[in-house]
Amino acid sequence: MTLLILLRHGQSVWNQKNLFTGWVDIPLSQQGIQEAIAAGESIKHLPIDCIFTSTLVRSLITALLAMTNHSSQKVPYIVHEERPDMSRIHSQKEMEQMIPLFQSSALNERMYGELQGKNKQEVAAQFGEEQVKLWRRSYRIAPPQGESLFDTGQRTLPYFQERIFPLLQQGKNIFISAHGNSLRSLIMDLEKLSEEQVLSLELPTGQPIVYEWTGQKFTKHAPSLG
């Protein structure tokens, strides 16, 4: 059984303040910290061989917190791919106690452009709720100077196919800690959702989604699988 675990980061400070965040590098709120720890509890008995996060701190910290009580007791270490010598471990004994963690901006949240840092209710009052709904939930319409969900998938899906999927095919169990829209674009592909179906896909913060790769398709499971 080969597993793919997806987790939207815990609540961030700007989630709490109802602000558009996008690529702005905002940390977790106190609630988000607790969500990340609770998420870890729900997956702590699931095997994990590799971790992938975005380059944004809320994604990274969520993954690290989620792994603190993992039953394997293995320690995540960040692989600096631009300088692999920096993170090379020269002890086989220690290597066996570690889990590699890779970061990529391909997994970053969709970039919200001119909306970043603005209050969502205030933006709705300024531009109208229907326009903001199109920016936030439509598949191909992007906010000013930002990305649509389609645009986000144009970077997320190639990275998944080139870097992550081959590991799943090798039987490696993968944990991805990322963002609402980067994960929505990925789930759209995994579950073969239409452009209309993905519009209603909501991913709460800090709640894992578990898939099994059967060798031919992805099957969704409850996190309690472990």
From Swiss-Prot:
GO BP terms, alphabetized: gluconeogenesis; glycolytic process
Keyword Isomerase among UniProt keywords: yes
Major enzyme class: isomerase
Single GO molecular function: phosphoglycerate mutase activity
Catalytic reaction equation(s): (2R)-2-phosphoglycerate = (2R)-3-phosphoglycerate
SMART domains cross-referenced by the UniProt entry: PGAM (SM00855)
SUPFAM superfamilies: Phosphoglycerate mutase-like
Enzyme Commission code: 5.4.2.11
The protein, known as: 2,3-bisphosphoglycerate-dependent phosphoglycerate mutase
Site (Transition state stabilizer) residue list: 179
Pathway: Carbohydrate degradation; glycolysis; pyruvate from D-glyceraldehyde 3-phosphate: step 3/5
Keywords per UniProt: Gluconeogenesis, Glycolysis, Isomerase
Active site positions, chain numbering: 9 (tele-phosphohistidine intermediate), 109 (proton donor/acceptor)
One matching Pfam family: His_Phos_1
Binding site for substrate: 8-15, 21-22, 58, 109-112, 120, 136-137, 180-181
Domain of life: Bacteria
Family under the similarity heading: Belongs to the phosphoglycerate mutase family. BPG-dependent PGAM subfamily.
Functional description taken from the UniProt entry: Catalyzes the interconversion of 2-phosphoglycerate and 3-phosphoglycerate.
Protein source organism: Chlamydia trachomatis serovar D (strain ATCC VR-885 / DSM 19411 / UW-3/Cx)
InterPro entries named in the record: His_Pase_superF_clade-1 (IPR013078), His_PPase_superfam (IPR029033), PG/BPGM_mutase_AS (IPR001345), Phosphogly_mut1 (IPR005952)
Gene3D superfamilies: Phosphoglycerate mutase-like
